[in-house]
Amino acid sequence: MLKGTNNEKLIGSGLKEEHLLFYQIWKELTESKTFDTYQYKSVNILNGICELVHDIESYLDGNTHTMHTIDAMREELLALIKRDSVMVGEFPSLRNRLLQSLSKKLDSTSRLKGLRYQLKYVYSKLESAYDEALTKKLVEAIETGADTQYQLTAQYISRCVDMGWFVKALSAKADTLKQEPARSKGTDSFLFKLIKAQKQNFSVFAPFRLKVVPKDGKSKEEYREAVIRHLSSFGIEVKTGIEIEGFCVGIEKAELKDTQQYMVVQTQAYDVFSAAHFSIIGLSEVLNTLSFFTAIESWSVSDISLIVYNTQSPYTKSLKATDVYRTYEYLDSSSKVYERAERIISPKGHCGHPLRQKLLSSFSYANLSRASMALEEKYMNIWIAIESLCRSDAQETIIDSILTLVPNALCLRYLYRLVRNFVEDCSRCDVEFVFSTKSIDMKMGDKDRLVTETIAVFRDTTLQPELEEKCRCNSLLHQRYQEMFQILTDPQTLIDKVEKHHTTVRWHLNRLYRVRNEIAHSGVLQEISAIRYTEHLYDYLATLVSEVTRFSAANATGSLGEIFSLINDNYMEFYDLSRAKQTDKPSVLGKLWTSGVMDFL
C-alpha cells in the first residue's frame, strides 16, 4: 500500500473512479521493495513451464543429481494451473492435459522426457496467445470490479518482468492513466500497449576511469590506448563527451563532460533501468576478462555511474549502480531482535554463548553480500549466511535443514506479520485507530501490544464495523480489511493461509537452491531474477534470526539443536491440531488469534 493513493486524492488527480482499485494494486505490486520481497508469490504459468523444463533438462544432462527441485517445481506448476482463471476459460484442453501429467509421480527417465516434450509444445502454443488472453481477462475484471483483479494484475506484471521490464519503469507507466489521451482510452489500451511493446535501442555511457596496469615497458598512456583497443574488439567504443554529443541528437548535454572519456555500450531494452542493467552485465563480462589478464586493476560495479540515452525517442537519465541493484533494511537496531542478539553477541560475559559464533558468522556473510554490487557475490554470500545459521547435525544435508527450518520459522509469526503490515497500510492511508470506546496508538513502541490490540478490534462486534468504515477511504485497503477479517475470524481461512504460505516458501527455497547451484557449478545467473531473489534471501534471513534469538531468550537456551527443534515442533503442533477432526479449532487457535504468534510449547 502506497502513501498518497486514497480514493479521493486519486480522483482529484484525474484518475477515473472505475480504475481506482487497479491503480492502487498496480502501484503496490510495482513498489520496488514489495516486488523484490514478495514476487515469488506471483510466478506465472509460462515462467513455471520454463523453470520445470530447465530443471528436467539439468537432471537429464547430469548437472543435478536429485529430484528436489523437479518435484517442487512440478507441485508449484500444478497449483498454478489449478487456480489460473485464464487457463480455465481460454485453454481448457491444454489445462486438462497438464493437470493429468503433473499429477503423476515422475519416477522414471522416460516419464521425465515425456513431460519435457509435452511442456515444450504447450509453451509454444501459450507463448503466442496467453498474454493476450490474460490481458483481456484483466480488463474484464477491472471493468466489472471483480475480486480477481489482484491476482490477475500480479500475473500480468510477472509476465512484463519476464519480458524484461523493470518494476520501477512499470510503476511510472500507471500514472499515464491520470492524463489524456490514456485516461479516455482506458485500461485496455494501456495494458495491450504495454504487453505488446517492442524493445528500444539505448546507448549507455560509463566514464572510462579504469586503472590500467602498464606492461612491456609501455607508458601508462600507451597502455591505456591498448586497453581502449581491447574494449573496441568487444564492441565497446570509448568516446569523449563532445564526440557523443555529435552523434546523439537530443542528449542532455548537462549530463556529459566535454573532455571526459566514456565507454559506450549499445543495448536493447524496454526501459532505462533494464538498459542500465544489461549494459552493466555487458561491461562486467569484458572488464572481468581484462582484470583476469591484469590489463586493468580489479574494479567494482559500485564505482560505475551511467548515462542512459534512448536513441529512438531521445530521453536521458543518469543512474548509479545502487539505483538498479538496491537492497533494503529488514531489521533495525531499535528492535527487540537487536536487543536479544546483542545479549548473545556482547563480549560482556557472553563470549561462551553457543549461538554467538553462529550469529557472527551469519552476519559477516550478510555484510559481504550487502557490500557487493556483483549479483553473483550478493546472492552467494547471503545464501551462505543462511546456510551457516541453519546447519544442524539433526538433518542429513544442509538443504534438508533449510527446507525444514526456514518455512517453519517463517510461519510462526506469519499472522503477526500480516497484522503489522495491515496497521502500516492503515497508517499510510491516514487511517487512525480512534474508535467509539477506545483508541490505539499506531506508533507505539511495543509492537506485540499493537498487534494484540488490533486483532481485538477485528474480533469485537462493536469496533469491527467502525474499522471497516475507516478503511473505505482506499479501495485496496478495504479489500485488505475484508481479507484480514476472514483470517482473524474464520479458523479454516487462517489454516489455509498459513499452510499455503508454508508450501510457497518451501517451493521457492528449492528454486533459490537451484539458482545457488547454477552460480556455484555452472556460472549461470538468471540476471534480472537474481536481483529480486537476493531480496527474498535477506527477508528469510532476517526472519530466521528473529525466531532463533526469540526462542533462545524465551527458553533460556543457547543450544541451536534445541532451538531448531522448538521452532519445528511449534509449527508441527499447529499443523496437527488444524487437521485433528475432534479439535475445537476456534479454541485451539484462540492464542494465535490473540497475539498473532504460534507459541504452543
Locate the predicted segments by residue.
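Charged, non-catalytic interaction/linker regions at domain boundaries
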Residues: K104-M380, I384, S388, I531-F600
